[in-house]
Swiss-Prot record:
Superkingdom of source: Bacteria
The protein, known as: Methionyl-tRNA formyltransferase
Reaction equations catalysed: L-methionyl-tRNA(fMet) + (6R)-10-formyltetrahydrofolate = N-formyl-L-methionyl-tRNA(fMet) + (6S)-5,6,7,8-tetrahydrofolate + H(+)
NCBIfam families xref list: fmt
Function: Attaches a formyl group to the free amino group of methionyl-tRNA(fMet). The formyl group appears to play a dual role in the initiator identity of N-formylmethionyl-tRNA by promoting its recognition by IF2 and preventing the misappropriation of this tRNA by the elongation apparatus.
Entries under Pfam families matching the protein: Formyl_trans_C, Formyl_trans_N
Transmembrane segments: none
Gene source species: Dehalococcoides mccartyi (strain ATCC BAA-2266 / KCTC 15142 / 195)
Gene Ontology CC annotation, any one: cytosol
């Protein structure tokens, strides 16, 4: 058992991997902070964050404050006597009083190559930007939004099949590796590198309306949205006054001469849609009220799909 006392703060799936890696290395997790349970699903039943479920399974103490700005909540955290706090997609702002608690500071695993893509959804931003490389930064958290100095970074190529969950899983593991390497150097931590604020970019929260297709944009951009916004909010258009979700797509350059939003049934079982540049081939899709299916299966039930305009 490593004697270093760690408080872990994280909420979604992304945070599971570094927490598991800390536990596997025998670190003493003296407390796990995660977001409060939220209503989810059609029944709106309270659902715990993924990190809470893992923490309880491992017998760890779980804390779910609505905010860490209250002195009484800060006193509880201080009472855990953490040497270091590790943050991975926690979702709450940490005031300066919290940042000052651990002797070795607050370490944050941020899934982008900082200062690029500061903000809440850097993985989606990486895919939307069409970047060739994705990455993760291990930084010292400070009061600004992802502005703290960086201890280490690692980059990986973005694959054509990467979606936000797939890419996030890979970055979570790499971030965990960076974290373990840095923790092994305590108490002799290296000097972190200041970020170049002049090169900083930001990307905020993803909202549902971002999933609405604008057929006046290039097919390559729409396809990136399909991968970036999977599984939520998804990418969608309309057909026959029903929502049509695009689950998987591929940009093409076939020179079919289609107008933006115009459908062409190609080679009998493929769906091409015109855009501002090139065609978007829809590979998997889901019509409102129906199950998700391949383009070929969809066309078997929609014999008049050729030539229609989507989103009108």
């Amino acid at each position: 058992m490593n004697e270093l006392r760690i408080v872990f703060m994280g909420s979604p799936e992304f945070a599971l991997t570094p927490l598991k890696m800390l536990l596997a290395e025998g670190y003493a997790i003296c407390g796990v902070y995660t977001q409060p349970d939220r209503p989810a699903g059609r029944g709106r039943e309270l659902c715990p964050p993924p990190v809470k479920a893992l923490a309880l399974e491992r017998g760890l103490a779980v804390y779910q404050p609505q905010s860490l700005k209250k002195p009484e909540e800060q006193a509880v955290l201080s009472g855990l006597k953490p040497d270091v706090i590790v943050v991975a997609a926690y979702g709450l702002i940490l005031p300066q009083a919290v940042l000052d608690i651990p002797a070795y500071g607050v370490l944050n695993i941020h899934p982008s190559l900082l200062p690029r893509y500061r903000g809440a959804t850097p993985v989606a931003a990486t895919l939307l930007g069409g970047d060739e490389w994705a990455g993760v930064s291990l930084m010292k958290l400070e009061a600004g939004l992802d502005t703290g100095p960086v201890y280490s970074r690692a980059a990986i190529p973005v694959r054509p099949e990467d979606t936000t969950p797939l890419l996030a899983d890979k970055l979570a593991f790499i971030g965990g590796c960076l974290l373990l390497e840095l923790l092994s150097r305590i108490p002799s931590l290296p000097q972190p590198e200041l970020q170049d604020n002049a090169k900083a970019t930001y990307f905020g929260m993803v909202t549902k309306d971002m999933g609405q297709v604008n057929w006046q944009t290039p097919a390559a951009e729409i396809e990136r949205r399909v991968r970036a916004f999977f599984p939520w909010p998804g990418v969608f258009t309309s057909y026959n006054q029903k929502t049509l979700k695009i689950l998987e797509a591929r940009p093409q350059k076939l020179g079919l001469g289609l107008q933006p939003s115009q459908v062409r049934v190609y080679e009998g079982d493929r769906i091409m849609v015109g855009s501002a540049s090139g065609e978007l081939e829809i590979i998997r899709l889901q019509l409102e009220g129906k199950a998700a299916c391949s383009a070929a299966d969809f066309l078997r039930g929609q014999r008049h799909f050729d030539g229609v305009n989507l989103g009108v």
